[in-house]
Design a protein with these regions (language model features):
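Histidine-centered catalytic micro-motifs
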Residues: 1, 108-122
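Membrane-interfacial loop-to-transmembrane alpha-helix junctions, especially the N-terminal start
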Residues: 8-25, 77-87, 140-156
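Membrane-interfacial alpha-helical segments at the cytosolic side of multi-pass membrane proteins
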Residues: 1-6, 122-138
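Membrane-embedded translocation segments of transport machinery
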Residues: 115, 129, 136, 143-181
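Hydrophobic membrane-spanning alpha-helices of multi-pass integral membrane proteins
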Residues: 22-28, 59, 86-93, 124, ...
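Membrane-interface helix-loop-helix modules in multi-pass inner-membrane proteins
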Residues: 1-74, 98-102, 161-181
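Conserved, charged catalytic cores of large soluble enzymes
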Residues: 99, 107-108
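Hydrophobic, membrane-embedded alpha-helices of multi-pass small-molecule transporters
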Residues: 91-97, 117-128
Length: 181
């Protein structure tokens, strides 16, 4: 709903969106069934078998294709730009889930890239853009004011979120400067 409304354009390919939904539902169901029968990699939050991770990546790429073309061919706003940055960041940091080193410390280093930077980094961009969209639509506040605050919010969220990731690295043997931050 948000993307077509903000871009003032229909979604690029509704058929592709339905294909993506079907693949997503199949992958989610397969992952849950796999968890029930003990078919997983054993990494917390990243325990999906490789073929499900590949399916998640394909679904994400279909989604990004559809959303990106909708925004790029429609009206470009700060809200849609921040939303696209967050969605692409989510996809990029997901790629670290494929790397599964034998060394536990190295594994945790990359694990935090996916888990922590998602939550306190790129998902903050998605949430801030959705919040800005809702503020404009529900309160009638001027778009310029909301977009200025959007930039302030995402700047603070990214800065504090990325710094906040550093304290996790202390416990895996990385330099201790992240602990003090």
């Amino acid at each position: 709903y948000l993307i077509p409304e903000e871009a003032e354009r229909d979604i690029e390919s509704p058929t592709l969106a339905y294909v993506q939904l079907g693949l997503f539902m199949f992958g989610a169901l397969a992952a849950v069934i796999g968890y029930l029968f003990g078919i997983h990699e054993g990494r917390e939050f990243l325990e999906q078998p490789l073929w499900i991770k590949v399916a998640i990546t394909v679904v994400a790429l279909i989604f990004l294709y559809n959303v990106s073309l909708t925004v790029l061919k429609g009206r470009k706003t700060a809200i849609s730009g921040v939303l696209l940055l967050g969605l692409w960041g989510t996809a990029v940091f997901w790629l670290f889930a494929f790397y599964d080193p034998a060394n536990l410390s190295v594994d945790k280093l990359y694990w935090w890239y996916v888990v922590h930077i998602w939550v306190e980094g790129v998902w903050e961009l998605v949430m801030a853009s959705v919040l800005a969209f809702l503020m404009i639509k529900m309160t009638g506040v001027d778009r310029e004011v909301i977009e200025k605050w959007l930039y302030a919010i995402i700047g603070l969220a990214l800065f504090s979120g990325l710094l906040g990731t550093g304290h996790h690295y202390y416990w895996i043997g990385a330099p201790g400067y992240g602990q003090g931050i």
